[in-house]
Swiss-Prot record:
CDD domains: DHDPR_N. The gene is dapB. NAD(+) binds at residues 9-14, 99-101, 125-128. The active site is at residues 155, 159. It comes from Oceanobacillus iheyensis (strain DSM 14371 / CIP 107618 / JCM 11309 / KCTC 3954 / HTE831). (S)-2,3,4,5-tetrahydrodipicolinate binds at residues 156, 165-166. One of its GO terms (biological process) is diaminopimelate biosynthetic process. This is 4-hydroxy-tetrahydrodipicolinate reductase. Residues 178-200 are annotated as: Disordered. Keywords: Amino-acid biosynthesis, Cytoplasm, Diaminopimelate biosynthesis, Lysine biosynthesis, NAD, NADP, Oxidoreductase. GO terms for cellular component: cytosol. Pathway: Amino-acid biosynthesis; L-lysine biosynthesis via DAP pathway; (S)-tetrahydrodipicolinate from L-aspartate: step 4/4. Pfam families: DapB_C, DapB_N.
Length: 265
């Protein structure tokens, strides 16, 4: 039986790729889309999509969820609306799969509680690329032996949040095995504010935003006489589709919120 899916943000770069992937999967059925405009139109009426995509577009999430019996709500929007979408989907007992980052700890706690109350799975993944998830796992392994580490994340210049959710998640995983410590010279001084990057438990995180980039990260470890670099590069957004496909399938069997694709692999 096909899984009925709603996609929020279909005209974005990630959303467009997700629509293409979902409509090619025999076990998935795209029943509706949520967008901030084009209410009442079908996807096929928009220039970037195939004419035969007769999938209705809504601008109001309540109307969308009331009109369609969806199993999964895939949100690929922005932090400003992603939290509201996720919360509303759970209230309608629809399982969210969320690629939007930038949620606060308080928002995540609220969504975890709501997911349990509704007995509906929810997956929030800072990164859907399988390679990026492995990079985070390998970084956690390396941090046991190399506690001095800095993270450099590079993204396209339209990304709104910094540092990226992937960088923060990587740092959180490293925190699990690394004692808090200040890195660098104890008397170091920034002659330009922010030159040393963001400080997370003594680790430094540096964010780059440039046109031409998609999603890239290096985790650089330093030790006596050696360095170790673990890196991942997404060359295009097709790299995220295997992760989204996996999440859509697995969220159907969950009854609580899972944060991070690494917890499903």
């Amino acid at each position: 039986m096909a899984i009925n899916i709603i996609v929020a943000g279909p005209r974005g770069r990630m959303g467009y790729e997700a629509v293409q992937m979902i409509t090619k999967e025999d076990s998935f059925r795209l029943v509706a889309c949520l967008d901030h405009k084009h209410d009442g139109l079908n996807l096929g009426e928009l220039e970037q999509f195939s004419d035969d995509l007769q999938v209705p577009i809504y601008t109001d999430i309540d109307s969308c969820l009331k009109q369609h019996q969806a199993d999964v709500f895939v949100d690929l929007t922005t932090p400003e609306v992603g939290y509201k979408h996720t919360k509303t989907a759970l209230e309608y007992k629809v399982r969210p799969v969320v690629g939007t980052t930038g949620f606060t700890d308080e928002q995540l706690s609220e969504l975890k509680e709501l997911s349990k109350q509704q007995q509906r799975g929810c997956i929030i993944a800072p990164n859907f690329a399988i390679g990026a998830v492995l990079m985070m796992k390998f970084s956690k392994m390396a941090a046991k032996y190399f506690p001095n580490v800095e993270i450099i994340e590079k993204h396209h210049d339209q990304k709104l949040d910094a540092p990226s959710g992937t960088a923060k998640k990587t740092a959180e995983l490293i925190q699990d095995v690394r004692e808090s410590q200040k890195q660098g010279h104890p008397k170091e001084e920034e002659t330009l504010p922010g030159a040393r990057g963001a400080d997370m438990d003594g680790m430094r995180i540096h964010s780059m935003r440039l046109p031409g980039l998609v999603a890239h990260q290096e985790v650089i470890f330093g030790g006596a006489g050696q360095t170790l670099t673990i890196s991942h590069d997404s060359m295009n957004r097709a790299s995220f589709m295997d992760g989204i496909r996996e999440c859509v399938n697995q969220v159907m069997d969950l009854e609580e919120l899972v944060y991070g694709l690494e917890n499903l692999l």
